[in-house]
C-alpha cells in the first residue's frame, strides 16, 4: 500500500485482471475490477502499476475499435478468438505498423504545448499533427523526416530544466485529466445532420452539444446512428455505452461500408 495511490491501475490475481483503486482508508483499498471476478479469493496478489488509467494518443486511433479501457478488439480477436479471455494486456496502437512522418521543425526551434512537430497522413482525408504535449516547453535538438513506428524515436527535446526527452509519435494521457486548451470558440456555424426534422426544427451547431431524451424503444440509438452516418463533419467518434449487442453489431457492419459524399471514400 505504500506505493499505491488513488486511481492507480492494478493487476489482480493470477490472471492479472485489470482494476483501478477507487477508495483508500489507511492500509485498505477498494478496487473496481473491469473484468469478471469469478475465482478471485482471499490472499490473491494485487500489484499496482504505479500509474493512473491512461490512453494512448497517436497515429492508428482512426478506424480502430476499442473496449472501454482502450484495448483493440480487432487485434484481440485475431490473437485470442471471439471469446475474449480475462487479463489480456494489448497495446492500444499497433506497434508494428510504420507511418511516414514529415518534420516541420528543426534544430534550435523553440516549442511549447500544442506546437506542431510535424504531420502523419493517417488516412486519405485526415492529416494527423504530432504536437508538443501539454506542460512541455523546450528546444528541439533533433527531428527527423522518415518512416517510423509509433514508439520509435523521431527526435529529441531539451526541456527548460535541462533534461532531454525523446520525441515519439505516441503520447499517453490519464483519462481523468481533461486535455487543456488555450480558448473556446463560440459555436457560429450549423452542423448539417442530414435529418430534415432536426435541421429544420432542432438545429445543432458545430462545436455544440445535443441531447436526445426518450423512453425505451423510442429510437434514441437510431437517431445517434443517423447523426454519426450523415452529419457534415470530418471525423466521427462513436461511443456505445450500455447499448444492446445487436445495435453495436449494426454499427460495426454498416459504418465501414459507408461512403463520404465529400471525399468519395
Q: Residue locations for each model-derived region?
A:
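N-terminal accessory targeting/assembly segments
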Residues: 1-85
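Short, solvent-exposed secondary-structure boundary/capping segments
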Residues: 28-34, 72-78, 129-130, 142-144, ...
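Conserved P-loop
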Residues: 221-264
Amino acid at each position: 500500500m505504500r506505493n499505491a495511490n488513488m486511481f492507480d491501475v492494478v493487476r489482480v490475481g493470477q490472471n492479472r485482471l485489470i482494476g483501478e483503486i477507487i477508495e483508500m482508508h489507511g492500509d485498505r483499498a477498494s478496487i473496481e475490477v473491469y473484468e469478471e471476478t469469478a475465482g478471485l479469493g482471499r490472499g490473491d496478489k494485487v500489484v499496482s502499476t504505479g500509474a493512473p488509467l491512461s490512453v494512448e494518443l497517436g497515429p492508428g486511433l482512426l478506424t480502430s475499435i476499442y473496449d472501454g479501457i482502450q484495448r483493440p478488439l480487432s487485434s484481440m480477436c485475431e490473437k485470442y478468438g471471439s471469446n475474449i479471455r480475462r487479463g489480456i494486456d494489448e497495446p492500444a496502437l499497433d506497434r508494428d505498423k510504420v507511418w511516414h512522418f514529415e518534420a516541420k521543425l528543426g534544430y534550435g526551434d523553440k516549442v511549447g504545448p500544442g506546437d506542431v512537430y510535424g504531420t502523419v497522413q493517417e488516412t486519405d482525408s485526415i492529416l494527423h499533427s504530432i504536437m508538443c504535449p501539454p506542460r512541455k516547453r523546450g528546444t528541439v535538438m533533433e527531428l527527423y523526416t522518415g518512416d517510423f513506428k509509433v514508439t520509435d524515436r523521431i527526435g529529441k527535446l531539451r526541456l527548460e530544466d535541462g533534461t532531454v526527452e525523446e520525441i515519439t509519435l505516441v503520447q499517453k494521457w490519464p483519462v481523468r485529466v481533461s486535455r487543456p486548451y488555450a480558448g473556446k470558440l463560440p459555436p457560429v456555424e450549423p452542423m448539417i445532420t442530414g435529418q430534415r426534422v432536426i435541421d429544420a426544427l432542432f438545429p445543432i451547431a458545430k462545436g455544440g452539444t445535443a441531447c436526445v431524451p426518450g423512453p425505451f424503444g423510442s429510437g434514441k440509438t437510431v437517431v445517434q446512428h443517423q447523426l454519426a452516418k450523415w452529419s457534415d463533419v470530418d471525423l466521427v467518434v462513436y461511443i456505445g455505452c450500455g447499448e444492446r449487442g445487436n445495435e453495436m453489431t449494426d454499427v460495426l457492419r454498416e459504418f465501414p461500408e459507408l461512403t463520404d459524399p465529400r471525399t468519395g471514400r
